[in-house]
Amino acid sequence: MLRTVIVAGALVLTASAVMAQQDLVDKTQKLMKDNGRNMMVLGAIAKGEKPYDQAAVDAALKQFDETAKDLPKLFPDSVKGLKPFDSKYSSSPKIWAERAKFDTEIADFAKAVDGAKGKIKDVDTLKAAMQPIGKACGNCHENFRDKEG
């Protein structure tokens, strides 16, 4: 009886730990999807498909800033190899193999976002600010994101 209780308790603890790590993967996916949506909004404004909207620009930058602050905490060794449930993209194992390079990519993104804050006032300044942000996103995705299938 005691053995059954101990085994059951160990299984519950293990399942809880795995679920907590999967939550980090899911949070990362949500942040990336939010980034993508905001880049689409900013891109539409920059292309003249939508009118300039300072509130939308500020909201996007706020979300990018939050992502930049959260990203360093979302890739502990314990999530290596875990896949998101609802995405065709996942974290590349290179994140852990090339950690210093990955951390530099995150820092580049944070620097690009920080450089844009308070400087975007119209379409022209938006276009200028989007270039380094987009470049930082693209570099990291090219190096540290895997596509399934």
UniProtKB/Swiss-Prot annotation:
<keyword id="KW-0479">Metal-binding</keyword>
<feature type="binding site" description="axial binding residue">
    <location>
        <position position="141"/>
    </location>
    <ligand>
        <name>heme c</name>
    </ligand>
</feature>
<dbReference type="GO" id="GO:0005506">
    <property type="term" value="F:iron ion binding"/>
</dbReference>
<dbReference type="InterPro" id="IPR002321">
    <property type="entry name" value="Cyt_c_II"/>
</dbReference>
<dbReference type="GO" id="GO:0022900">
    <property type="term" value="P:electron transport chain"/>
</dbReference>
<dbReference type="GO" id="GO:0009055">
    <property type="term" value="F:electron transfer activity"/>
</dbReference>
<keyword id="KW-0813">Transport</keyword>
<protein>
    <recommendedName>
        <fullName>Cytochrome c-556</fullName>
    </recommendedName>
</protein>
<dbReference type="InterPro" id="IPR012127">
    <property type="entry name" value="Cyt_c_prime"/>
</dbReference>
<feature type="binding site" description="covalent">
    <location>
        <position position="140"/>
    </location>
    <ligand>
        <name>heme c</name>
    </ligand>
</feature>
<keyword id="KW-0732">Signal</keyword>
<keyword id="KW-0249">Electron transport</keyword>
<dbReference type="GO" id="GO:0020037">
    <property type="term" value="F:heme binding"/>
</dbReference>
<feature type="binding site" description="covalent">
    <location>
        <position position="137"/>
    </location>
    <ligand>
        <name>heme c</name>
    </ligand>
</feature>
<dbReference type="GO" id="GO:0042597">
    <property type="term" value="C:periplasmic space"/>
</dbReference>
<dbReference type="Pfam" id="PF01322">
    <property type="entry name" value="Cytochrom_C_2"/>
</dbReference>
<comment type="function">
    <text>Low-spin monoheme cytochrome c.</text>
</comment>
<feature type="signal peptide">
    <location>
        <begin position="1"/>
        <end position="20"/>
    </location>
</feature>
<feature type="binding site" description="axial binding residue">
    <location>
        <position position="32"/>
    </location>
    <ligand>
        <name>heme c</name>
    </ligand>
</feature>
<comment type="subunit">
    <text>Monomer.</text>
</comment>
<dbReference type="InterPro" id="IPR010980">
    <property type="entry name" value="Cyt_c/b562"/>
</dbReference>
<keyword id="KW-0349">Heme</keyword>
<keyword id="KW-0408">Iron</keyword>
